[in-house]
Each structure stands twice: as structure tokens, then as C-alpha cells.
């Protein structure tokens, strides 16, 4: 967005005469007040952004270590114990632990094969041919980071490889279009188009979300086609986490634990996730490892 373009807020003024920031990545108080009152969205201050960035880097490091440890024969409970140790090492708090109702019982989510999201670690060993999403959310000094990745165990069937590839491609394509003034619905458009090229479906029961000051904030970021016209603005932080199914988009919540979401047709599902920051000129992926 250029200085002489119309401002994203709809005032019909040029951006430079309206919400153009006086300093890089320092949105005006008027912008924060507008987004808080109109959309209940927290536009972060430079100090908050720096603390969220730190939390996101810790989250990414823990996720990276867990992905490297996920091998055939390892149980997801063993990964959860490693997660506990890593959180202590980084002086971080696992955000999922005891979250919600019923309280989530583990420090990470491990979603295998047909589990769409919110998989609960257990004592079943990982097997050759499994795919798994590991989702890590950390609290560091009171601020939150959130990211996830797919891992493939041993020799994985081609269709499972394809759905992992499609989800990552959809995430990267959605991130690539981010900039101030972009309406939120464009994210869902890009993801739907990407999934369609593979012949896969996009889960619409779960969404991305604002994150940083709280675990879950506005805006909710739909990965499917939608009509949300909220314009992105510098200082917004949120997750993009497309869940792509090989078969039908519908899922159901496991009635035995009230957390795990599974595909209704038991076909594989895949998800990748990053926390992103909207900047004055585009975006920053906060959960991208700095090394």
C-alpha cells in the first residue's frame, strides 16, 4: 500500500492523511481505538509486538525439537513429556494444558491421520505410514505464540504426502498476499483455490484466530470462502492454520474425550500453522525460526 492510496479505513482520504503511521510499525492510538471499538481487535503496541515475537520464537523452537523427535515407535505421550521439559527449559507455560472445558489434559496437540485437530497425546506408538500434526502454543512472560507442523513417519502413502503438501502450500499462499488493507476474506479465497487444485476440501468448523495478548482473540480467520471484509492493519497478530481433508470437509468431535476432531469419512487430514504480524508494508512470520 502506497502513501497516496485510499486509506484502508474507508474514509476516502489518502492513506498519508489518515492512518499512515508516523513511525515504522507504530500504529496510531486512533487506529487502536477504532479497531477495538469496531471489531474488538487488539492492535499491538511496539512493546507488545516484541514480547509476542519472543514468545513465538520459543514456540517455534519447541515445535522444531518435537518434530525431530517424532519417529516410529515413539509415543505421543513421550513427545508430550519432552514438551514439558522444553517448556521448563525456556521458562514457558504450555497454553493448552487445562485450557477449556473439559480441561485439555496435555501440553501439546498431536493429531494423527484422520484427526483434524486437538488430538490428545497417548501411549500408542507412532507407526510407519502415519502422518501427524504437532501443535505447540506457549506463554512467555504473559504473551502467546502458536504454530504447528506436519511430520511423516517412515514410508507414507502418496495421498498422505499430497494432503500434507497441499496444506503447506495453502498456508504459504495465504501468507504471501498479506498486507495492510487486505480484506480478511481473501485469505479463505486463496486457501480454497489451493485445496481445489488438489481435489481436496477445506475444513470450515475450525478457524485461525488473533493471538498474542490472549490465546484466542479476534479476528477469527476463516480458511474457507467467506464474506468477512475486516481490513488488515499494521499491528494485528493472528494465526493462519488451514486444515485440508482428502475427502469430505466435515468432521465430528470424539464423544469419549470431547476434544479430538476427526474426519467424518476417516480420510486423512493435514494442517500447518504460523503466527503472523501485519506490518506497514506487508507481513512478518513470527513463528519462523530465526536461524
Swiss-Prot record:
GO CC, any one term: cytosol
Binding site for a divalent metal cation 2: 146, 209, 241, 273
Cofactor(s) named in the record: Co(2+); Zn(2+); Mn(2+); Fe(2+)
EC number: 3.4.11.18
Ligand binding (a divalent metal cation 1): 135, 146, 273
Alphabetized UniProt keyword annotations: Aminopeptidase, Hydrolase, Metal-binding, Protease
Keyword NADP: no
Cofactor descriptive note: Binds 2 divalent metal cations per subunit. Has a high-affinity and a low affinity metal-binding site. The true nature of the physiological cofactor is under debate. The enzyme is active with cobalt, zinc, manganese or divalent iron ions. Most likely, methionine aminopeptidases function as mononuclear Fe(2+)-metalloproteases under physiological conditions, and the catalytically relevant metal-binding site has been assigned to the histidine-containing high-affinity site.
GO biological process, one term: proteolysis
Binding of substrate, residues: 118, 216
Single GO MF annotation: metal ion binding
Reactions catalysed: Release of N-terminal amino acids, preferentially methionine, from peptides and arylamides
PANTHER family xrefs: METHIONINE AMINOPEPTIDASE
Role description: Removes the N-terminal methionine from nascent proteins. The N-terminal methionine is often cleaved when the second residue in the primary sequence is small and uncharged (Met-Ala-, Cys, Gly, Pro, Ser, Thr, or Val). Requires deformylation of the N(alpha)-formylated initiator methionine before it can be hydrolyzed.
Assembly description: Monomer.
UniProt-listed HAMAP family: MetAP_1 (MF_01974)
Family designation: Belongs to the peptidase M24A family. Methionine aminopeptidase type 1 subfamily.
Protein name according to UniProt: Methionine aminopeptidase
Organism field: Chlamydia muridarum (strain MoPn / Nigg)
